[in-house]
Amino acid sequence: MIHTMIAPRRLRGIIDLPGDKSISHRAVLLNAIATGAAEVANFLTGADCLSTIACVQALGVRVERHEDTVRVFGAGLRSLREPVDVLDCGNSGTTLRLLTGMLAGQEGIFAVLTGDASLRSRPQQRIVAPLRALGATLDGRDRGNRAPLVVRGAYLHGGAYDLPIASAQVKSALLLAALFGDGTLTLTGRTDGRDHTERMLAAMGATITVDGQTIRLTPPDRSEALHPLSLRVPGDPSSATFWWVAAALHPDAELTTTGVCLNPTRTGALDALRAMGAQIDVANQRVEGGEPVGDVTVRSSSLHGIVIEGALIPRLIDELPVLALAAACAEGETIIRDAQELRVKETDRIATVVAGLTALGAVVEPTEDGMIIAGGGNLRGATLESHGDHRLAMTWAIAGLVGAGETTLHGAEAVDVSYPEFWNVLRRIRE
């Protein structure tokens, strides 16, 4: 699909966001192993989360969906059914990695998990190695580093693991596996990724504690169960960031995103934009589904360059492509570092972002773990490619709203992975 964009005169609107992708995945996966039924409202109906539903259905879990409301009839901790076919995770790394952890402790189950070409190219040793240390029997291409992954459910034990990278997917895979283990799992090191799994497990009755950078989970005994958790999924801050950047960069804009998840592990993009000088108001703050939420309004702003690094990176890793676009339009230099994780996303997002920004007229230098963006650029229209990466597709769409001339995007359908309504919203806010 090809979309062509030119900058509108104004941007105005109130945007009801799709449900958060991370929470939507976890709401289905965790309720699948609870005992009883749960209702999940504002579920993200993007392709990734639908892959999660299809996989748990293949494991014998009843799931019903009506528009953006999903009912999950949990099978219980040890009642998943062996799938009769390969589990296709599509483009979803979250589905593949969390399901691998969940199935690793399902004694007697044999499962093969795969995905599309992009997912099959992404490294999996980051989950395979620590799961094997807990007793999991796993294999895959490239000595277990690439999907398809083969899982033979086994008897797992507890233990301690020091996380070398801040990855919510790795952390969550280990916590899900530990539910079926014998003994407490202790996680230390880079536990500073998204904490939705920890929050949901605690709400469902699991014995889990978080003390600074140390997480401990003691598995329930065989007579215990996880309680089903009904919730309304808050709006996805990763999706909201595209509108925040559009409003900050456009010379005549005011956009409000409602019901945004304001979990501190997810507000890195807000913090970065504030540091760059964006005019941001947060109102109507409240708690929904165990997560802090609020309404965020961003207006036209004069941005300046900053350094994005260190502990901030895990809190905005998915938003870095569009933040790089903001940096290209800001005054002064922006340095992004400690973000080597970008190289193993749906694309090598360092290479693809640098190439796209350069085509738009920005001056950008790639580094091994990030990029240096000169800033001050008056972006021009260009012909750009999404490479099948949903974050890139939306980043280049925003570039088309703020650059001079016409921008043409190839592969525009990639937005369906996480934001199926993106193009409809974009049309509505243009004036």
From Swiss-Prot:
3-phosphoshikimate binds at residues 21-22, 26, 167, 169, 318, 345. Keywords: Amino-acid biosynthesis, Aromatic amino acid biosynthesis, Cytoplasm, Transferase. It catalyses: 3-phosphoshikimate + phosphoenolpyruvate = 5-O-(1-carboxyvinyl)-3-phosphoshikimate + phosphate. Pathway: Metabolic intermediate biosynthesis; chorismate biosynthesis; chorismate from D-erythrose 4-phosphate and phosphoenolpyruvate: step 6/7. It is found in: Cytoplasm. The keyword Transcription regulation does not apply. The active site is at residue 318. One of its GO terms (cellular component) is cytoplasm. GO terms for biological process: amino acid biosynthetic process; aromatic amino acid family biosynthetic process; chorismate biosynthetic process. Phosphoenolpyruvate binds at residues 21, 93, 122, 169, 349, 391. GO terms for molecular function: 3-phosphoshikimate 1-carboxyvinyltransferase activity. InterPro entries: Enolpyruvate_Tfrase_dom (IPR001986), Enolpyruvate_Tfrase_sf (IPR036968), EPSP_synthase (IPR006264), EPSP_synthase_CS (IPR023193), RNA3'P_cycl/enolpyr_Trfase_a/b (IPR013792). Monomer. Gene3D superfamilies: Enolpyruvate transferase domain. It comes from the Bacteria. Catalyzes the transfer of the enolpyruvyl moiety of phosphoenolpyruvate (PEP) to the 5-hydroxyl of shikimate-3-phosphate (S3P) to produce enolpyruvyl shikimate-3-phosphate and inorganic phosphate. It is an enzyme of class 2 (transferase). This is 3-phosphoshikimate 1-carboxyvinyltransferase. Belongs to the EPSP synthase family. Transmembrane segments: none annotated. Its EC number is 2.5.1.19.
